[in-house]
């Protein structure tokens, strides 16, 4: 499957680039955007799109992979990217065991995304200094936002006022909840996020 769309937020050395891929295009929940900020990737995309993802990433310098949570569309290719780019991905502490040992996924999710591969990760700290290339560094803050998943962590770049929201925000209203989602935690996490001073939100599904 080819790249469906590309996204570019031009801001000099702090520019963000993304590409959308997916086996199906039945709505925003069946495609996925991998974002790149300099030499850092935000999430790894689904395994059944690896041929496309590999083709895009192969010529790029990638030194850091940040995983927002363990779900297969976000973490699926972390193992492959770690080998391709010789890096150790960062992941939230609460998701590391599932990423390392694997976990069952429902049939529908396997059809849409494929099955995630086990991957060794290092713990995503509360603050991390990352390279953006050309001797440019910036700080990212990990913001725990449980509700959609216990380990869901949003990534806040205070200097650029960027928020990478994982699956925290996809649409303006919820039509249904997954069986493992917690509505009260979702609301509390949203309230936490609106206290942050961000100007641009990057959603891996909506854009």
Predicted regions, residues:
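Conserved beta-strand hairpin/beta-sheet module of binuclear metal-dependent hydrolase folds
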Residues: 3-57, 154-166
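Short Pro/Gly-enriched beta-strand edge/turn motifs at strand-loop
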Residues: 13-21, 110-112, 135-140
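Short, flexible loop segments at the rims of nucleotide/cofactor-binding pockets, characterized by
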Residues: 18-25, 41-45, 65-68, 140-144, ...
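Active-site neighborhood of phospho(di)ester-bond hydrolases with catalytic His/Asp-centered motifs
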Residues: 42-45, 63-71, 89-93, 144-147, ...
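Active-site environment of divalent metal-dependent phosphoester hydrolases
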Residues: 47-49, 70-76, 96-99, 150-152, ...
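Active-site HxH/HxHxD metal-binding segment of metal-dependent hydrolases
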Residues: 48-132
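Metallo-beta-lactamase
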Residues: 141-146, 150-207
